[in-house]
Amino acid sequence: MRVRLLEATENPEELICQSARNDYMSDWVGDTPLDTAMASVDGDTTDEKLSNLIAQLLTRGHYGPFEHPSATFAIEGVSRSCMAQLTRHRHASFDVQSMRYVAFDDVDPAAVAEGELVVTPPSATDPDWVGRNQDAGDIDEETMAEREAVFQASVRRAVEDYQELLGLGMPPEDARFVLPIGTEVNVVITLNPRSLMHVADMRAAADAQWEIRELTEQLLDAAAQWCPHTFEYYDAEMKHRKNRLAP
């Protein structure tokens, strides 16, 4: 799994703060320099003022200004299961790699058992891993080895069957039906800081599945490089308060 920031609003936190100050100014923000708009905010430098105002907005629950900037992220190599969870957040915009137009006919099925093309869940290899709705806890080495072997054989066979169906002339859009839900997919997502914080409220939580938790952490890390004061405050003061930022 990898996440990369593709494109984003420049100076997003200046935009957030200008938008927020608009609500309390008699002058038109369109004609007002940033320093003037921020004159009444505590801080010795513009950066301190931005940080302080952003903290105030988030503390008070004034989330509207965080909807003005937007960022687009490229996501590589998440499972179709994780993608389905992510795209339930309908306030974001998505493009998803197509299995109708992209055929995986050059993938070595032997490599699939080692993690290529199909995401391997931790419970397939880690005997100490405990997931939700799990029937058993600790397992012996023999059972763990059998579990891993069954998983690897299953995903390898699925890819072999998929490629055989392609060779028999079945279109990719139909042959894909035999591929597992763990098949990797690339996604492009666009959303604003408020929306991303809402995603994190739900998907960085302990009861979210491991893969989307990892994806959410990578999105937050990338967003912190773009919008640092916002996501540093969110991480320190607001993270894990589930659903507080519901749009």
Swiss-Prot record:
EC numbers: 2.1.1.148
Cofactor(s) this protein requires: FAD
Record keyword Transcription present: no
Active site: 203
Occurrences of domain ThyX (ranges): 1-237
Reactions this protein catalyses: dUMP + (6R)-5,10-methylene-5,6,7,8-tetrahydrofolate + NADPH + H(+) = dTMP + (6S)-5,6,7,8-tetrahydrofolate + NADP(+)
Keywords: FAD, Flavoprotein, Methyltransferase, NADP, Nucleotide biosynthesis, Transferase
Residues bound to FAD: 88-90, 192-194, 198
Binding annotation for dUMP: 85-88, 98-100, 176, 203
Keyword Methyltransferase: yes
A molecular function GO annotation: thymidylate synthase activity
Alphabetized PROSITE patterns for the sequence: THYX (PS51331)
Pathway: Pyrimidine metabolism; dTTP biosynthesis
Family in the record: Belongs to the thymidylate synthase ThyX family.
Record HAMAP family: ThyX
Function: Catalyzes the reductive methylation of 2'-deoxyuridine-5'-monophosphate (dUMP) to 2'-deoxythymidine-5'-monophosphate (dTMP) while utilizing 5,10-methylenetetrahydrofolate (mTHF) as the methyl donor, and NADPH and FADH(2) as the reductant.
Subunit structure: Homotetramer.
Annotated protein name in UniProt: Flavin-dependent thymidylate synthase
